[in-house]
Swiss-Prot record:
This is Interleukin-15. Residues 1-29 form the signal peptide. It holds the Pfam family IL15. The gene is Il15. Glycans are attached at residues 10, 104, 108, 119, 143. It comes from Rattus norvegicus (Rat). It comes from the Eukaryota. GO terms for cellular component: cell surface; cytoplasm; extracellular space. InterPro entries: 4_helix_cytokine-like_core, IL-15, IL-15/IL-21_fam, IL-15_mml.
Amino acid sequence: MKILKPYMRNTSILYYLCFLLNSHFLTEAGIHVFILGCVSVGLPKTEANWIDVRYDLEKIESLIQFIHIDTTLYTDSDFHPSCKVTAMNCFLLELQVILHEYSNMTLNETVRNVLYLANSTLSSNKNVIESGCKECEELEERNFTEFLQSFIHIVQMFINTS
């Protein structure tokens, strides 16, 4: 199972550092190192999670062979590279439909992980304004298999540019 918060992987190292510096708290330098160490625990890492997103999407692809998903989702199959953030936001909104319509625990857990990883990685691009892009509702509705193929394609574009 994937870690839902991959940027928290190395926090235990900082805790050990804090305990190590415990004997040096009486010095001003020790206090500064301790405070900076504690502050850095809350800062997210900037590493891209797109490879993990692609892995989870491929896992969903294998899961749907055993689960009958009869839904159509707005799918941007021919998006322009200058609209990739807008297209990704549409894919993420549509993926939430699966959470609401299907109750398979493994599927929902994987979908939640995709949403979390993609949103946390995309958060730095949330305020990007891309002009001339289609709204989500203007996109063509496709079945879930085609939706996943297009989703994997756009994630691959993010991997190639990071």
